[in-house]
Amino acid sequence: CIAAHTMGTNGNSVQVQYWTGSAWADLCPVTAVTSDEPIMVIFEPETRQRWRISITGGTAPEVGVIKFGTAMQMERPIYGGVAPIPMARQTILRSNYSETGEYLGRVQQRSYLSASYSWQHLTSDWVRANWPDFQRATEAEPFWLAWRPGTFGDVGYCQVDEVPIPSNMGIRDLLSVSMSVRARGYD
């Protein structure tokens, strides 16, 4: 996963590679980066000690965050009610007016992305096996979130203001969990 970068602006291409012990092997094809949105490369698990990101073309980019790790796939998908993170823009504006009420202008104080996710009917076994590690990780640092990565390329480099806590649904051993995330804007 890569975030806080300028590879789209700089016209770069990216490729993920790992060391086999004698040479670098390609994990994915060279891919042109078309925006400065966060990037998530999903692949079959590999146990390797050395990884690298090969960046080619364009001018030298700035890259703020790179992480390798195991992606947690939710037990059940979310089908509706989700605002695509790139379109969930929240902008705080400050307008200025004259003494007589005439509009003088506006400044943008900050902009970020904000979305909410809610999963239902998660089995107790799955939640107990997978959620505690994720929950602790959200307390410590931002994380990447991809909604339906096989269909859409929407990826957010997110953080939570409140730790997401699963709750019993009252149906057999099923739980639900919701979280509101704030993501870094990239423009």
Regions found by a protein language model. Name each.
Residues 1-11, 22-187:
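Extracellular/virion structural assembly segments
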Residues 13-17:
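Beta-strand signatures of extracellular beta-sandwich domains
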